[in-house]
Amino acid sequence: MTDEHFDTEATPNPEDVAGSVDDRFENRIVMSVPDEHNPKLQKVIELVNADDDLYGLWLAANVNAVERLGMTDHGPVHVKIVMNLAVRMLRLLANAGVTSGVALNYEMSAKDAEVVVALAALLHDVGMSIHRQDHEAFSLFIAQEKLKQILQHVYDSRHETIIRSEILHAIISHRSGGTPLTLEAGVVRIADALDMAKGRSRIPFE
């Protein structure tokens, strides 16, 4: 795993938080995470990068956070960093013998746990596109349908329901006072906290 490159230091261009809709899309942040050994995660990232609706939600979330509320960014750069941090931590824990929730309770694989963590990280703040207040609950509302659209290309209906439920649990667990009940949810909560404050805090993994 030493040759894997996790992008945990992406920085937004000025265009990412200013300009017309077309300008913002032209300066699109491409989602990526080391996924060559996980075909399911690879497919998920491919679908995410082809989804203009999802990218628009990230842009709207960032406008509310940065331009209207003066907060740190909650858009595509933030979720990309959180995803890379979360997947990296999950792999380190898996290598140390820690069992994921989907493995413990459903006999699913570490690759499935990576899908849970990646999509929870990517969707945890989409509710900011509506409002900061109660954004975690809004994120659940938005993510429910978006996850169905993405996961139907990766899982059969039975497994899709379980994976979607695990992702939604991880999303709601990142709220203040939230209680993660799975390894995956805990990892996403920590990864979100690590990408913090203005200027961002970074943990070097390489």
Report the location of each language-model feature.
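Histidine/acidic-rich helix-loop-helix segments that form or flank divalent-metal centers
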Residues: 104-108, 156-206
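Short, conserved phosphate-binding/catalytic loop or strand-edge motifs used
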Residues: 117-119, 140, 163-169
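Post-HEXXH active-site segment of zinc metalloproteases
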Residues: 132-145
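Amphipathic alpha-helical interaction segments
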Residues: 81-84, 121, 138, 166, ...
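Post-HExxH zinc-binding segment in Zn-dependent metallohydrolases
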Residues: 146-157
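Amphipathic alpha-helical interaction surfaces
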Residues: 85-88, 92, 149, 193-196
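Acidic/His-rich, divalent-metal-binding segments that scaffold phosphate/diphosphate chemistry
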Residues: 3-135
